Amino acid sequence: ICYIYLNFFWGDEMKFQSTRGLEKGISSAEAIVRGIAKDGGLFVPESFPNLYSKLKEEKNLSYVDLAYKIISKYFTDIKAADLKEAIKDAYEGRFDVTVNNGFMELYHGPTCAFKEAALLFLPQVMKRAKKAIGVKEEVVILTATSGDTGKAALEGFKDVDGFKVVVYYPNNGVSPIQQRQMSTQEGNNVKVFAINGNFDNAQTGVKEIFGDEEFKKSLLSKGYILSSANSINIGRLVPQIVYYFYGYFKLVEQGKINQGDEINVVVPTGNFGNILASYYAKQMGLPINKFICASNDNKVLTDFFRTGTYDKKRELILTESPSMDILVSSNLERLLYEACNRDGKIVKDLMKSLNSNGEYKVSDDMKNFTNEFYGNFANQGEVYNAIKEKYKREGYLMDTHTAVAEVVYEKYVAETGDNRPVLIASTASPYKFPRSICKALDIDVEKLNDFEVIKELNKMTGIEIPENLKDLDKKQVKHKEVWDKDEMRKALLSYLK
């Protein structure tokens, strides 16, 4: 397999370019602060440094040290000392990754979801990127969330000087625990809006605000510039590469594989950022064979990898893995860019077709390029069954999103016979979706509220409740506003007035 765009020049400056072709040679600090390119495209690094051969010689690097070695190759215009400090402030004593029986648990942090791997780091690096390019204005972080991103962004950015963070989530479209995590958020620079609509409406609304030059000018005159904490921001994507290296080295340490062995990676997928980070890790030399893309009933990606047609013209189904209830996977655009040999015009035309016709079809060459990806989906019955069986057999408790990955992985092995060692991204604590887990385990919680359900699940399984979810129901609700999906600009202005 050829690894594309390898960059053999150590210490080189890394520049970024837009997937839609308009901008090239953008510094990392600017790409991070702006979040999205002028043509609506997403920033990608102009090359991928081959780091695996170097890193495999270094034994037992801590997460913080490994993060520095990887991230520093991309964000080259932020001073080394500043970057080290950003990584330390983000992770030390706050975030941990464990690999347990092939499950890479990414939820041992303040919000109990994998998003914090990126969202504890983003505010720290953005603060320093802002300094590097001399931005004086206050940066307003706009985020649409299907559940986990919102809380992780609020937690990461709260009380960080020079920033405000505004989160939009679909009213009744996130779990009660997720909603309570956001509505009780503390901090003097945070705002949460529920919108009447689904996640795609929220994400589209945020993208439209970013694309509205007049609106942005009027904000600038008030001393504000906009940026994003969604995974469209390259400052969020790059730190996610780290845990694939870390997980791989853990498998080596545990004697599950030898250095250099190829593994498969399974990722429960919504916006395509997490699985794309594993693809980027492979471009950096990490030995990955197959990227197994697991969807719930919203199986747009499954259909895409099978047919080469991306079709969002379907009803969004609300499932028990709400963080994956998405019809437009924004980060797929970055993979398409690699698939067409970095031809921005092709990507631009595909995205235009998606916007105006609700679908696009890629060429045969591009379809063949995606053969390293396998897509499949899991329905609710399969998810419940997987949670129950795993717990019964091994005493291991998965959340609903991780269970989607487990089901799809089993389907992959059954179809292909490929049972080489695997890393399954476990993306959230089961305690974030306690009612679903109890249903799967046949624990009757019909008459209990979600916070009582947490306690019941703990009583029945003995699995510890994460510290930050323990007294969530006792916290004061601070954010109660609900706006219509067409009033997102208005909501923002009401906060920034």
Regions found by a protein language model. Name each.
Residues 2-497:
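PLP-dependent amino-acid enzyme catalytic core
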